[in-house]
Amino acid sequence: MLQPASRRAARHTSTSALKRFFAIADAWELSPLQQCRLLKIPSPQVLERYRLGQAPRLSATQQERAALIANIQYSLTADAGLKDRAWAWVHAPRKSPPFDGDSPLYFMLENGLPALREVARLLVRESEPR
C-alpha cells in the first residue's frame, strides 16, 4: 500500500511537472486545445482545472508527456538567451524527416507520444558534440 508520504511526493512531482508544462505552453503560445492534445487531457475545461490545481494527479503517461516537453524545451534553450529560438523551432515548418514540411508542433500534435519521444531524441542527438 502507498504510504501517505510517497503519495504526497507523487502529487508534488505531478504539480511541478504541470507548472513547468504550463510555463512552456505559454512560451510556445499554445492554444488550450493544443495543450490538451499534447498532454492528452480530455477538454479545455479539465485543462483549466489542472491549471488551477483542482484536477486529479497526472497519469504516468501524462507525466511522461510533460517530461518530454520539458526535455524538448530544455534542449532548445540550453544556450542562454535563446528563448525565442524554442518558439521559432517549434512553429517553423521543417523539410527534414520526420517532419516532411510540417512544423515540429504539428508533428507532435498529430502523432502523440511516439512523436514527443522522437523529437526529444532528435534534439539530444543534435546537441551532442560532433
Describe the role of every protein-language-model region.
Residues 1-130:
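Non-transmembrane "mature" sequence context
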